[in-house]
């Protein structure tokens, strides 16, 4: 009703709405103002602009690749963890701070950037085009096992995870380390899609109970091919929550002793939220 009352302070109105929607019984029901709604939506999208890597600075002040996000421009060009980036075009990494480098990359979205990097002491040059990438799935192939790091569950996580599993399958990998530490969840449908890449078709991924006590079953999706693993080791901690816990439950229920969980007890969130967007850009998330 704020638009029907003249000169009503918008901040006061937001505080009133926030007070009405904040429940001690359910900390997951929230009203988001414009800034909070944008931040929440961005966190679910998992979308970033860049080369598709995370990195750290070494003693030479060069940028060492720590992770390469699957399906990104860096991934498509074959960059790997421990590659040491020396320069981007004429911009030397050792002479610039990380903020300058990141700004340069973002400013050249859609344009060729010449990258010089070291791998095992040998210098290489390649052209990368900074662009949009999903920052939720990292896939590494090691001697005898594969590692997939899943940071959250975005709209694209399911297909990116499927691509990662295909990569492990092509490499003949039969042991998977699935890192879900600090994964706070995201889209439940993404957990459904990811489960479908690991468990048999027609398997139950999870059951939902509505407010009337009615149960519905969600089954593994047919369009995702199961890649069989001889052993799956899941890494979890106290910040592993929501959709990540659904995924762990689906794997343990359907694959039994094939799955081993390692780490501390997960967060323990078994409820699903729905987000309702409003025309002014704010939104309401409720259980």
What are these model-predicted stretches?
Residues 64, 100-139:
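PDZ-domain C-terminal substructure recognizer with occasional recognition of PDZ-binding tails
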Residues 154-174:
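A short, well-ordered alpha-helical element
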Residues 141-157:
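STAS-typified acidic loop motif
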Residues 74-98, 176-179, 254, 262:
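Conserved PDZ fold ligand-binding element
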Residues 2-62, 112-113, 120-127:
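Extended, small/polar residue-biased N-terminal targeting/export presequences
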């Amino acid at each position: 009703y704020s638009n029907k009352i003249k000169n009503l302070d918008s901040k006061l109105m937001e505080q009133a709405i926030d007070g009405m929607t904040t429940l001690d019984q359910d900390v997951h029901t929230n009203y988001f103002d414009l800034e909070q709604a944008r931040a929440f939506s961005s966190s679910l999208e998992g979308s970033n602009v860049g080369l598709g890597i995370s990195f750290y600075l070494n003693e030479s002040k060069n940028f060492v690749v720590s992770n390469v996000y699957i399906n990104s421009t860096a991934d498509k060009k074959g960059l790997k963890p421990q590659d040491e980036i020396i320069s981007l075009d004429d911009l030397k990494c050792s002479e610039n701070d990380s903020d300058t480098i990141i700004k340069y990359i973002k400013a050249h979205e859609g344009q060729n950037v010449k990258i010089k990097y070291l791998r095992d002491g040998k210098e290489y040059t390649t052209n990368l085009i900074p662009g949009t990438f999903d920052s939720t799935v990292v896939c590494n192939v090691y001697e005898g096992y594969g590692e997939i790091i899943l940071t959250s569950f975005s709209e694209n996580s399911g297909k990116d995870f499927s691509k990662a599993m295909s990569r492990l399958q092509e490499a003949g990998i039969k042991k998977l380390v699935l890192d879900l530490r600090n994964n706070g969840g995201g889209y439940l449908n993404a957990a459904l899609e990811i489960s479908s890449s690991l468990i048999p078709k027609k398997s139950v991924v999870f059951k939902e109970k509505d407010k009337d006590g009615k149960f519905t079953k969600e089954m593994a999706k047919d369009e995702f091919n199961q890649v069989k693993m001889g052993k799956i080791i899941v890494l979890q901690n106290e910040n592993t929550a929501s959709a990540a816990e659904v995924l762990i439950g689906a794997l343990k229920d359907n694959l039994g002793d094939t799955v081993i969980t390692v780490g501390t007890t997960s967060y323990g969130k078994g409820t699903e939220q729905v987000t309702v967007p409003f025309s002014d850009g704010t939104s309401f998330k409720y259980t």
